[in-house]
């Protein structure tokens, strides 16, 4: 199956379960991590033909997605003597996708790159759309670029080696999209047999359906708003809270999807307090998240510090915090005129 991301410039295709032989008349630089390399690199190498193939592995995890690791990647690219015709392949989860795309975008002012995601989260979200970047002490993804891949290959067979926790984290991003754009997808999610899914014993068909539906939805959003000036901001539902949680826990306590799950619950509580979302719909999201074993609570130790951290969010402007909310489920919107008192009151409910 193929889904085309129809951008005015740099259009590309997402191939779902269609990874066949890839031929390059250039050098290829594969960026991955030790775990994925051990599990799947042999399979990938059997499908690539190129002038030369270089392999680099870096530690995986949000705590390593920083400028220090980026410098390490760039040094390996220079040591490999890549030129502007070379191709970088990001082979891993969302962290590898973000860093690989960023490295490709700044190496010699830009070389081609391909995403081959190996986690559900990367398949449904991170690998498509052209967002690249790294974290720093001030927050998440504050250093980066918009740089589209030349192609994306999502292979559901790679997902079979994921843990219960990793699969659930990917589902959080899928739930996010449904809550923002299409509540019928929430009905689809509710019907999934979570036991077989989370134990990765189901047929590839379920993964394929999830990936296809999410990519079709996200591609339509990116086509309308590639640089995140309006509609695409809705894909940050739950992320305003999640990024603060991740930063405050040094990116070690939660997987990104887990933090997003908590962030959605917090965003819904804010919407509920403002009279924009009813209690039944707020509970529906909680129930779906719990169905997949995702966390729905976080203890805020210092409400004022948490509030101030919002202002490092990329969606904040003119000293206002733009929150992405659902009202009702399936219809997201951005609200930037919420008083400090209302925000603080919601945060206090999580102390």
UniProtKB/Swiss-Prot annotation:
Subcellular localization, as worded in the UniProt entry: Cytoplasm
Transmembrane segments: none
Residues involved in Zn(2+) binding: 173, 239, 256
Cofactor: Co(2+); Zn(2+); NAD(+)
Residues at which NAD(+) binds: 60-65, 94-98, 118-119, 131, 140, 158-161
Gene3D superfamilies: 3.40.50.1970, Dehydroquinate synthase-like - alpha domain (1.20.1090.10)
One Pfam family in the UniProt entry: DHQ_synthase
GO molecular function: 3-dehydroquinate synthase activity; metal ion binding; nucleotide binding
Keyword Nucleotide-binding recorded: yes
GO CC field: cytoplasm
E.C. no: 4.2.3.4
Signal peptide per UniProt: none
Free-text comment on the cofactor: Binds 1 divalent metal cation per subunit. Can use either Co(2+) or Zn(2+).
GO BP term, example: chorismate biosynthetic process
Chief site of localization: cytoplasm
Function: Catalyzes the conversion of 3-deoxy-D-arabino-heptulosonate 7-phosphate (DAHP) to dehydroquinate (DHQ).
Family classification: Belongs to the sugar phosphate cyclases superfamily. Dehydroquinate synthase family.
Protein name in UniProt: 3-dehydroquinate synthase
Organism: Campylobacter jejuni subsp. jejuni serotype O:23/36 (strain 81-176)
Gene for this chain: aroB
